[in-house]
Each structure stands twice: as C-alpha cells, then as structure tokens.
Design a protein with these regions (language model features):
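Structural recognition of beta-strand segments within beta-rich domains
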Residues: 51-55, 60-65, 69-75, 80-83, ...
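Bacterial N-terminal signal peptides that target proteins for export
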Residues: 1-9
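Short hydrophobic/aromatic-rich beta-strand segments that constitute the beta-sheet cores
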Residues: 42, 69-73, 88-91, 98, ...
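Acidic/charged, solvent-exposed loop-and-adjacent secondary-structure segments enriched in E/D, K/R, S/T
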Residues: 92-114
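Well-ordered beta-strand positions in beta-sheet-rich domains
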Residues: 56-60, 80-82, 98, 155, ...
Length: 200
C-alpha cells in the first residue's frame, strides 16, 4: 500500500510539475513579439470547392514591430500590400492607397497581423484559443466567438516554433486557405526602402 501511495504521490508531483512548466498563451505572445523585424517568404494555397487544384500565390513579407506588415505578392501577379494600425493599403503607380475597411479580406488581413505579432489579447476578443505543444513546436486553434466571424470561419489553426510557420483558415462554405511562412529570419533591420514604405 505504501508503494502504491508513493507512486501516486510521485505521479501527482510529475503532473503538477508539467502543469507548472506548461507553455501558455502569455509565453507564446512574448515569444512571437520578441523580434523587432522579421523577413521571410510565403506560399498561399487557396482551396476552392469549385476547383480541383488549389490557387497558389507566392511572395515575401516584412513584419516590423510598431509599424505593421508588408505583404509583397510576386506570383501569379505582382501586388504590394501594407497592413498597419491605420488599415490596409495597396500600392499603385502613385503610391500607397488605403482600402475601405469593409473590403473583402480586410478582416482576414488584420487577423494575420494579430497572429504574426503574437497579439493573443486581440485574438481572444474574437476567438476561443486552445494552445498545445511547447515553445519549439506549438499549435494554436482559434474558434470564432462572434456571429459575424462564425459566418466566415469554422476554425483557424496556427502552428510554429520560434516564429509562426503555418496558418490554416477553414471557412464555413468548405473553402480553405493555407499560408506557409518560409525562410523567416529575425536578425535583419528594415532597409531604407522598407522604412519608407512604412512611413508613407
């Protein structure tokens, strides 16, 4: 009986220890918010029910703390976007043009920014968050709270390590989008051109 109780005691201690060391949302937020600047490449796959093959687009991105996100689409067409606290802007021949806040994809782009910057408090306003894994390999599941978001998304799955690696958006109508962030680096400062893009 003594051995059994000791085993139970050891098990309880192990459980408490693992709970104390559990990777939580606060730690994830701090981890993702650490880098001042992140440069990387992305591949986006849009799976539409009506099409047998996904629509694939590729490009590069720059995420800068206190500035926002530059989303530079290279293929199948070239188009630059800037997502910041001011809203979403698209570059044309005359410079950056702010898009209407209710434009298609505006909510999705704001969501990307919150995810990449580790803004869990911002995400918690709109989603139930469930985190699993550890600092090196984690997965975050977002389930919409609001009626509006429930009309668009069933669920959003985000996974990564030091930085975000993959974002998967599962839409209510059966379509889905998978974003893969590749070759992300957090050591390089903003170039003069990038600083100019954020300042405009």
């Amino acid at each position: 009986m003594n051995v059994f109780l000791k085993s139970l005691g050891s098990l309880a201690l192990l459980t408490l220890s693992s709970l104390a060391n559990a990777f939580d949302l606060q730690q994830l937020s701090e981890q993702l918010a650490k880098p001042d600047v992140i440069h990387g490449q992305f591949t986006q796959e849009k799976h539409l029910r009506a099409l047998p093959q996904p629509l694939i687009s590729k490009g590069s991105f720059v995420l800068a703390k206190n500035h926002g996100l530059l989303w530079l689409l290279k293929t199948p067409l070239q188009q630059d976007y800037r997502i910041s606290a001011k809203g979403i802007a698209r570059r044309d021949a005359t410079g950056w043009q702010l898009l209407p806040n209710k434009s298609a994809g505006a909510e999705q782009n704001r969501l990307f920014l919150a995810v990449l910057q580790g803004d869990s408090s911002g995400l918690q306003r709109d989603f139930e968050l469930a985190l699993s894994g550890d600092a090196q390999q984690w997965q975050l599941t977002l389930t919409p709270r609001s009626v509006l978001l429930k009309q668009v998304f069933n669920q959003i799955n985000i996974s990564g390590g030091t930085l975000v690696n993959t974002i998967e958006l599962l839409e209510t109508q059966g379509d889905s989008t998978v974003l893969r962030m590749q070759d992300s680096t957090a050591g390089q400062p903003l170039s003069d051109a990038e600083q100019h893009d954020f300042a405009e």
